[in-house]
């Protein structure tokens, strides 16, 4: 084992590296960068499942999927390197009232990769890809639940915060299990083993129940913060879109889980013969209510953006994922309700998300090359 002086030398080397300009990206990297995965992944999912397809669209989705996988492993490598070189930064991140909230972006970004495996790889590669996605999903679900349970408790016990300094980023660790539950519905729908599918959707309903009501509590507190202290600072104004995330993804998750329940419950004689139909109908009903609730939060966000200028930062990725998951709920309602209205609206939202992804991705690459995002 290294001696005390050996540890000192390691720390000294890490400190010297931190001061070098070419290490600044690793030194100042934080979990919020995984929002790039969230935005890229949801864009690939939307294009793959667009109600109105055209030749070549599938290949664009495949390219984005591959890009997302590359970015994810790049960011994971940078994160591991950062905390190996500067172990104290991990504790500092957990103690930071803002950066700790961004931990939720890691499993949510990973969930988009799992969904793309189901949508893109399973139809080509078959059952083994479905089982592979299922295994990855269990990892994602465990990490999501751990973050959802741990970070809010840190907020209660360790972080110094006030109503005035609150932002919608408080939702991020709580939304992670909502995304995992929705992803579980997608994975379960691809499983050929009905027992595995049943276990998966029951776990998903439990995760949904753990996270969505808590997200609603946060929304109440956030509305009170806005009513009393007015809009958040301009640097964080893009976070105004975050509330539509749990509402859109929560609604999509219930509908997707209902689809699987309708198919699997009768086969396994689970509960009553009509249990699957009840879960399916109730899921669609609650999803419609959540979607409607999301509309007013979307209006609040859009109205907030008109109140003044705001400048680019990594938080701009909130332009993509929250609206993206709201769009998945929209297109799913078009599918389940056989509604051209929701198909057209979902297509419009998908185009908006794709355009925002192009803009934000280009700015992110440029600002990363100039290292402005790391200072």
Curated annotation (Swiss-Prot):
Principal location: membrane
Glycosylated residues (UniProt): 193
Keyword annotations: Cell membrane, Glycoprotein, Membrane, Transmembrane, Transmembrane helix, Transport
Record topological domains on the Extracellular side: 47-59, 123-135, 189-200, 256-277, 331-343
GO cellular component, one term: plasma membrane
MF-aspect GO terms: sulfite transmembrane transporter activity
Regions crossing the membrane: 26-46, 60-80, 102-122, 136-156, 168-188, 201-221, 235-255, 278-298, 310-330, 344-364
Top-level taxon of origin: Eukaryota
Localization, UniProt: Cell membrane
Membrane protein topology class: Multi-pass membrane protein
Record carries keyword Transport: yes
InterPro entries in alphabetical order: SLAC1/Mae1/Ssu1/TehA, Sulfite_efflux_TDT, Voltage-dep_anion_channel_sf
Protein family per UniProt: Belongs to the tellurite-resistance/dicarboxylate transporter (TDT) family.
Biological function: Sulphite efflux pump required for the secretion of sulphite as a reducing agent. In the presence of sulphite, cystine in keratin is directly cleaved to cysteine and S-sulphocysteine, and thereby, reduced proteins become accessible to hydrolysis by a variety of secreted endo- and exoproteases. Excretion of sulphite mediated by an efflux pump also represents a detoxification pathway for dermatophytes during infection of the epidermal stratum corneum, hair and nails, which are rich in cysteine.
Protein's recorded name: Sulfite efflux pump SSU1
Protein's organism: Trichophyton rubrum
UniProt gene name: SSU1
């Amino acid at each position: 084992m290294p001696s005390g002086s050996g540890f000192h030398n390691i720390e000294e080397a890490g400190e010297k590296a931190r001061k070098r300009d070419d290490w600044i990206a690793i030194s100042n990297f934080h979990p919020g960068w995984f929002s790039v995965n969230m935005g890229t992944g949801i864009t690939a999912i939307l294009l793959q499942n667009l109600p109105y397809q055209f030749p070549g669209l599938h290949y664009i989705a495949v390219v984005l999927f591959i890009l997302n996988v590359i970015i994810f492993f790049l960011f994971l490598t940078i994160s591991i390197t950062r905390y190996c070189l500067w172990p104290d930064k991990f504790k500092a991140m957990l103690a930071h009232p803002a950066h700790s909230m961004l931990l939720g972006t890691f499993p949510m970004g990973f969930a988009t990769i799992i969904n793309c495996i189901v949508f893109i790889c399973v139809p080509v590669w078959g059952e083994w890809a479905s089982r592979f996605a299922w295994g990855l999903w269990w990892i994602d679900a465990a990490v999501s639940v751990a973050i959802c349970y741990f970070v809010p408790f840190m907020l209660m016990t360790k972080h110094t915060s006030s109503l005035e300094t609150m932002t919608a980023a408080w939702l991020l660790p709580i939304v992670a299990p909502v995304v995992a539950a929705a992803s579980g519905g997608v994975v379960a729908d691809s499983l050929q083993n009905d027992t595995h599918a049943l276990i998966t959707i029951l776990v998903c309903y439990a995760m949904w129940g753990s996270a969505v009501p808590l997200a609603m509590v946060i929304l109440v507190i956030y509305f009170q913060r806005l009513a009393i202290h007015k809009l958040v600072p301009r640097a964080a104004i893009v976070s105004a879109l975050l509330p539509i995330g749990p509402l859109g993804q929560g609604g999509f998750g219930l509908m997707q889980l209902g689809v699987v329940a309708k198919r699997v419950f009768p086969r396994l004689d689970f509960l009553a013969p009509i249990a699957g139909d009840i879960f399916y109908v109730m899921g669609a009903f609650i999803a419609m209510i959540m979607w409607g609730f999301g509309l007013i939060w979307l209006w609040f966000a859009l109205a907030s953006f008109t109140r003044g200028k705001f400048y680019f930062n990594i938080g701009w990725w909130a332009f993509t994922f929250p609206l993206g998951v709201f769009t998945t709920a929209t297109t799913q309602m078009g599918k389940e309700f056989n509604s051209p209205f929701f198909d057209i609206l979902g297509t419009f939202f998908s185009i908006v998300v794709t355009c925002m992804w192009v803009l934000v991705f280009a700015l992110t690459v440029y600002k990363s090359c100039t290292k402005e995002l790391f200072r």
